[in-house]
Design a protein with these regions (language model features):
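Short glycine-rich, Thr/Ser-proximal phosphate-binding strand/loop in the N-terminal lobe
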Residues: 8-49
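Phosphate/pyrophosphate-binding loops at sites that engage ATP/ADP/AMP, CoA/4′-phosphopantetheine
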Residues: 60-73, 173-177, 288-300
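Short beta-strand-loop/turn "lid" adjacent to the catalytic site in phosphate-handling enzymes
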Residues: 62-110, 128, 136-148
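Adenine-nucleotide phosphate-binding core of ATP-dependent small-molecule kinases
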Residues: 242-297
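Conserved phosphate-binding/catalytic loops in two-lobed NTP-binding clefts
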Residues: 312, 316-342
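Structural signal for terminal/edge beta-strands and the immediately following C-terminal loop/tail
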Residues: 332-373
Length: 373
C-alpha cells in the first residue's frame, strides 16, 4: 500500500533527554529533543523508576504542541537490555517488555526505557510497537567471546542502532550492499563504540558500557585490572560500575562530561584539557587498528558517526593515524530516529517481516566448554 500515509512515532531515551519524532511515511513531521531536569532524574534510584516521570514529560509535550497520536500506525522505541538478540526489527510483546525491564542482558542503561515507553503509549493510542537493533545485538565471532577466565565471556554491547544504520547507508553511498563489505564503524559521542563489520555482521567491538575500549566523555574505558583493583579499595562496586558509564572520562578529569566545555578550555590554552582530549582520540585510533586485525586487514572503509564529529580535529586525527588502513568517511550526528521510522515503515508496507523475541539469548555458551562435552 505505497499510497497510504503511515504515521510513526519514535522514542529514543537518552541519559538527560528523550528524543521524540513523528513521521508520515518518509517525511519527518517534527523531531524534538526534550531535556529533563537533572535534579529530577537524580531522585530516581534506578532507570526503571524514571518511567512514570518520562511518560508524564512525553504526554505534556504532546499536549502542549497539540499532537494527537490517536490512530497512530506504529510506535518505535529504542531497544534496551533484553537477552542478546540477532540484528533486525522486532515486534514488541509483553515478554520483550518484561525482559527489558528486568535487564536480562545485564545492562542497566537508559535505553531500557524505550520499549517500555512505547508499550505504555500503545495502551492509550493503539498501533503496532517495534524496536530495532537494540544495544544487545549479538553477532560476535567465537574468537571474540573468549576471555582468560573460563566461563566468563565477552559480551556484545554497542550502539548497534546507529552503527548498523550508518553502515547500511554508507554501503548504499558506495553503490554496494552492506552484506558484501568489510567495514570498521565507529560511534563517537558520550559513549564510543569501535566495531568490525564483516559481510553484514558486527563480529567484534569494544563493550563500551562494560569498561572496554577508549575512555569517553562519560566512561572510564579500559584499564589494567590491577589498577582497577587498587581503585576498588577506595570505591564500592556500585561506585566503580558508575565510573564505567557515567562518572569516568571527561567527568572524572574535569568534573563535566560536556565536550563543548572541554573544547573551550583547549581553545583557551588549557594544556591538560588538550592532553586528555588527544589521548581519547589516540585510544579510538588504537581500537580501530585492533578491528583492522580482526578483519585480516581487508577493510573497505573506516566509517565514523556520532555527535563528537562536530569537532573536525577528531576526524582529521583519525585520518592521519588510520588512513593507511582504509579510506575514512565521516557521517556526523546520528541516524537513529530515521532508522527506526524507516524500518517500521517497511514493515507496515509489507516489504519486511518483523522478528519475534524468543525469550532466549541468541548465544548461550560453547558446547565444547561445558563439563560433559
Amino acid at each position: 500500500m505505497q499510497n497510504k500515509v503511515y504515521r510513526i512515532f519514535v522514542i529514543n531515551p537518552g541519559s538527560t533527554s528523550t528524543k521524540l519524532a513523528l513521521f508520515e511515511n518518509e517525511r519527518k513531521v517534527f523531531s524534538e529533543n526534550v531535556f529533563h531536569d537533572s535534579a529530577e532524574l537524580l531522585k530516581f534510584e534506578t532507570i526503571n523508576a524514571q518511567l512514570p516521570y518520562r511518560m508524564r514529560v512525553i504526554r505534556d509535550f504532546l499536549a502542549e504542541n497539540a499532537i494527537d497520536l490517536t490512530g497512530i500506525d506504529a510506535i518505535v522505541g529504542r531497544g534496551g537490555s533484553s537477552y542478546p538478540v540477532a540484528s533486525g526489527i522486532y515486534e514488541v510483546d509483553e515478554l520483550l517488555v518484561r525482559h527489558t525491564r528486568e535487564s536480562r542482558g545485564r545492562l542497566n542503561h537508559v535505553s531500557n526505557l524505550g520499549v517500555q515507553l512505547a508499550a505504555e503509549l500503545q495502551k492509550e493510542y493503539g498501533g503496532r510497537v517495534f524496536t530495532l537493533d537494540p544495544t544487545v545485538v549479538d553477532e560476535l565471532c567465537d574468537l571474540a567471546r573468549v576471555t582468560g577466565l573460563r566461563g566468563v565471556h565477552r559480551r556484545a554491547i554497542a550502539h548497534a542502532l546507529n552503527l548498523k544504520e550508518t553502515a547500511r547507508r554508507h554501503a548504499a553511498f558506495r553503490g554496494r550492499r552492506y552484506e558484501e563489505m568489510n567495514l570498521i564503524v565507529c560511534h563517537i559521542d558520550g559513549g564510543i563504540s569501535v566495531t568490525a563489520h564483516e559481510k553484514g555482521r558486527m563480529i567484534d567491538g569494544n563493550n563500551a558500557a562494560g569498561g572496554e575500549g577508549p575512555f569517553t566523555p562519560t566512561r572510564m574505558g579500559g584499564m589494567a585490572v590491577t589498577d582497577v583493583v587498587e581503585h576498588l579499595s577506595r570505591k564500592t562496586p556500585a561506585e566503580l560500575l558508575q565510573l564505567c558509564t557515567e562518572g569516568g572520562g571527561f567527568s572524572s578529569h574535569f568534573g563535566t562530561s560536556n565536550a563543548d566545555e572541554v573544547h573551550r578550555r583547549i581553545e583557551a590554552g588549557d594544556e591538560y584539557a588538550k592532553l586528555v582530549w588527544d589521548a581519547m582520540v589516540y585510544q579510538i585510533c588504537k581500537e580501530i587498528g585492533a578491528m583492522a586485525a580482526v578483519l585480516y586487514g581487508q577493510v573497505d572503509d573506516i566509517v565514523l558517526t556520532g555527535g563528537l564529529l562536530r569537532f573536525a580535529e577528531i576526524e582529521q586525527t583519525i585520518r592521519e593515524r588510520c588512513g593507511f588502513i582504509a579510506p575514512v568517511v565521516a557521517y556526523p550526528g546520528e541516524l537513529e530516529l530515521e532508522a527506526m521510522a524507516g524500518t517500521a515503515l517497511r514493515v507496515l508496507r509489507g516489504e519486511l517481516s518483523p522478528l519475534h523475541y524468543t525469550g532466549r539469548p541468541v548465544w548461550d555458551g560453547f558446547a565444547c566448554e561445558k563439563p560433559n562435552a
